[in-house]
Structure formats: structure tokens, C-alpha cells
């Protein structure tokens, strides 16, 4: 007969697919933008800020980790997560730079990196009729994800996200 510990143990194969956003979850996009712009990202018009970022060599691949996000990455890494991130249509370097950042800072293979337009994220909310999990800082993405049948974790702090992951069986 199985003991209680064995009965409560979650089978990792039964866990849902796990997707993690990049900007403001793992890497500090807004801090990088502030460095380039000399002020907060939203304090200049869209065209000006994106032009400055696009002209700043190595912007994307040299972003710093978000505070505490290495701990988050270490937790999810053992579950072979996907990185699901929106690329900027205003900066042709964003796709390549994000791939470089991921290659330099994580062990997520290129085959598990999905860069899409923001509105396309929700199309990954389920897999073969089963809900997938998305960790994302942008509440609109979480709401759209959940409306499509997925499980959303609104990332506002590493400790909160880790707790929610644990509740889902990602120990």
C-alpha cells in the first residue's frame, strides 16, 4: 500500500506545459530602457523611445536579470519551460537580442523559445485540450490566457509566483 507522501506526490509528467515571459519577469527591460533613455520608458513618445532603443547596440542581449528572477528560473528550469515573449515590431533587433539573452543566461534550448506578437501569446493557452501555465507580468496577457482556457500566474513578485507555482505542483 502507498503511503500518504507517495499519494500526494505530483507526477511531473502530469504537470501542464509551462510558459514564462521574458521582459519584467526574467530580464529587467524597464531598467535597461531607463538607462538608454535617461528617464522612465513611458516618459517619452513611443517613436522616440523605440528609435533610441533600436539604435543602442546590444540593448536586448545585455539586459540585467530582474531582482530575484534567477531563483524563479532555477525553480522552473527543471520542468523544461518554454520562453514565450513578445517581440517589438518597432525594433528589428529585439528577436535576435532576446534569443542572445536567453542563450547567454539560461539553458532553455532555442526550440523552446517562442517569440510572437503580444496578442498571439494566448494561442498557446492550451495544448491538446489541456491548460498550459503562463507566468507574465502584464495582466492583459494573463486575462486573455485564462479566457482561452489556460492557467495564468500574474507575476508581481518572485515570492508570489513561486508560491503559485508550488500550489500547481511545480515544487
Language-model-detected regions and their locations in the chain:
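Conserved Lys-Pro-Asp/Glu-containing loop-to-beta segment of HAD-superfamily phosphomonoesterases
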Residues: 17, 113-142
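A short, structured active-site edge motif that brings together acidic residues
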Residues: 82-95, 99, 103-123
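Short catalytic/ligand-binding loop motif for oxyanion handling, primarily in non-cytosolic enzymes
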Residues: 27-30, 35, 81, 90-94, ...
Amino acid at each position: 500500500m502507498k503511503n500518504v507522501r507517495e499519494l500526494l506526490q505530483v507526477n511531473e509528467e502530469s504537470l501542464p506545459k509551462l510558459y514564462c515571459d521574458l521582459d519584467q519577469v526574467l530580464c529587467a527591460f524597464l531598467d535597461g530602457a531607463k538607462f538608454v533613455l535617461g528617464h522612465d520608458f513611458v516618459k517619452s513618445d513611443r517613436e522616440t523611445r523605440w528609435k533610441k532603443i533600436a539604435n543602442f547596440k546590444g540593448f536586448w542581449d545585455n539586459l540585467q536579470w530582474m531582482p530575484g528572477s534567477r531563483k524563479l528560473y532555477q525553480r522552473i528550469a527543471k520542468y523544461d519551460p518554454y520562453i514565450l515573449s513578445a517581440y517589438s515590431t518597432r525594433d528589428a533587433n529585439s528577436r535576435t537580442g532576446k534569443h542572445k539573452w536567453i542563450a547567454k543566461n539560461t539553458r532553455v534550448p532555442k526550440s523552446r523559445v517562442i517569440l510572437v506578437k503580444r496578442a498571439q501569446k494566448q494561442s498557446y493557452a492550451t495544448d491538446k485540450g489541456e491548460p498550459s501555465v503562463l507566468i507574465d507580468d502584464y495582466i492583459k496577457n494573463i486575462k486573455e490566457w485564462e479566457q482561452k482556457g489556460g492557467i495564468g500566474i500574474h507575476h508581481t513578485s518572485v515570492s508570489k509566483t513561486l508560491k503559485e507555482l508550488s500550489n500547481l505542483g511545480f515544487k
